[in-house]
């Protein structure tokens, strides 16, 4: 079984994935943000850094999915992830326009065909105030410039 947990930033995806892992005796595939060299600049100037940020996430998640999901599925093990590969296309539609969005969509479509889709997606929600409080509490440097 491949279970993915989705929702907006700060909603508790990683926390829930870690809580469920022992109960399902599953592997854990967590989204890695810290390695994106464009992310903190993106939060400061979305228009300028959107394409680089989105492309980095797209390729990074693709390689993570190809390795992590395939490894667990081939071994017959369950897997819990705190993101879906498809999610980044939603962010691209919000942050990109014109030729950049067209380029992103073409690459995403080609890569998406090669990824394994979750058997179940759990979507988490909470109030904006709760989200902003959680984001402030974890104090990640690249999230400090986020707008509500």
PLM regions: where:
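A glycine- and Lys/Arg-enriched "phosphate-lid" helix/loop adjacent to the NTP-binding pocket
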Residues: 88-148
């Amino acid at each position: 079984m491949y279970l993915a947990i989705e929702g907006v930033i700060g909603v508790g995806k990683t926390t829930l994935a870690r809580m469920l892992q022992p109960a399902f005796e599953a592997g854990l595939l967590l989204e890695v943000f810290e390695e994106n060299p464009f992310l903190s600049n993106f939060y400061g100037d979305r228009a300028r850094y959107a394409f680089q940020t989105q492309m980095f996430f797209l390729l990074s998640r693709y390689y993570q999915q190809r390795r992590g999901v395939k490894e667990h599925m081939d071994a017959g093990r369950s897997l819990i992830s705190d993101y879906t590969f498809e999610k980044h296309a939603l962010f691209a539609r919000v942050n990109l326009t014109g030729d950049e969005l067209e380029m992103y969509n073409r690459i995403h479509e080609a890569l998406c065909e090669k990824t394994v889709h979750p058997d179940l997606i759990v979507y988490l929600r909470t109030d904006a105030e709760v989200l902003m409080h959680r984001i402030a509490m974890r104090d990640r440097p690249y999230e400090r410039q986020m707008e509500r």
